[in-house]
Amino acid sequence: MLTERQLLILQTIIDDFIGSAQPVGSRTLAKKDAITFSSATIRNEMADLEELGFIEKTHSSSGRVPSEKGYRFYVDHLLAPQNLPKDEIVQIKDLFAERIFEAEKIAQQSAQILSELTNYTAIVLGPKLSTNKLKNVQIVPLDRQTAVAIIVTDTGHVQSKTITVPESVDLSDLEKMVNILNEKLSGVPMSELHNKIFKEIVTVLRGYVHNYDSAIKMLDGTFQVPLSEKIYFGGKANMLSQPEFHDIHKVRSLLTMIDNEAEFYDILRHKQVGIQVKIGRENSATAMEDCSLISATYSIGEEQLGTIAILGPTRMQYSRVISLLQLFTRQFTDGLKK
């Protein structure tokens, strides 16, 4: 159990180091208004905090820096909510104020804005396409044998693919098919489209389309689209601006991981509800052992739809990032309810 004096010194060391990226010595602490005790007392308390594992020495300075244990204690017990500037709140709310809420577009823009507001790397895992509902489908002929099928969902996701049009299917058949599909399938979840088409729509099409078998075969290929989440990054190179990562050898594996993107699918899937903070080696990926990852989920009711996360150095502005993520996830959740 830390004393009140030790708590104050630990919080002051971490706050100062987060802001300056410089090791903190007793002389620096003695100049702080909140620290009213002698330099000797400060040194003794710092020695105790170091022995307890909350701070540690660096090779290049006589000052101390927070350890992972120190950051964890800080996040769990010392962190105070930070009020965001009014202009930032307005900027974020404006993003979600559009009359037509397109989740894909919002997810992409959220990653960009968060990276700009924090100068860290922002990652947004969008909703699974399987949870989207079909808004409409278009089939646009390119020539006699090919066409582009354009599928639009209620979240604004647009999926297009080139399909082969059988010789036996004419343009009037295509037009009839599209009209029937939009009439019968609008509002149906993407994950249910295949069953809906082959249990109900095929019966309807039989009465309207000539060359029925060829049309159904083409239709089957049209709706074979990936239903997994999309991941969006903002500020992929922002880590290079952090003093901790000026050594390119140290940051190379992290940048490779960010650039490949795939590992973040597993990291961000199945997150617990609410704000989660992973510090240093608490992260499963070795490339992230000098980083902190703060994530938050957004959902509708009990259904978790996606994750918003910020990746930065362990010397991260935890309070500010958490406040930003809370605002973003709240706005995202409200937008999805529109």
Curated annotation (Swiss-Prot):
A GO BP annotation: negative regulation of DNA-templated transcription
Ranges annotated as spanning the membrane: none
InterPro entries named among the record's database cross-references: GAF-like_dom_sf (IPR029016), HrcA (IPR002571), HrcA_C (IPR021153), WH-like_DNA-bd_sf (IPR036388), WH_DNA-bd_sf (IPR036390), WHTH_transcript_rep_HrcA_IDD (IPR023120)
Entry similarity comment: Belongs to the HrcA family.
Function: Negative regulator of class I heat shock genes (grpE-dnaK-dnaJ and groELS operons). Prevents heat-shock induction of these operons.
Keywords from the named record: Repressor, Stress response, Transcription, Transcription regulation
Residues spanning the signal sequence: none
Name the record gives this protein: Heat-inducible transcription repressor HrcA
Family matches, as Pfam families: HrcA
Matching SUPFAM superfamilies: GAF domain-like, Winged helix' DNA-binding domain
Membrane listed as a keyword: no
PANTHER family: HEAT-INDUCIBLE TRANSCRIPTION REPRESSOR HRCA
Native species: Bacillus cereus (strain 03BB102)
GO molecular function per UniProt: DNA binding
Gene: hrcA
NCBIfam families (alphabetical): hrcA
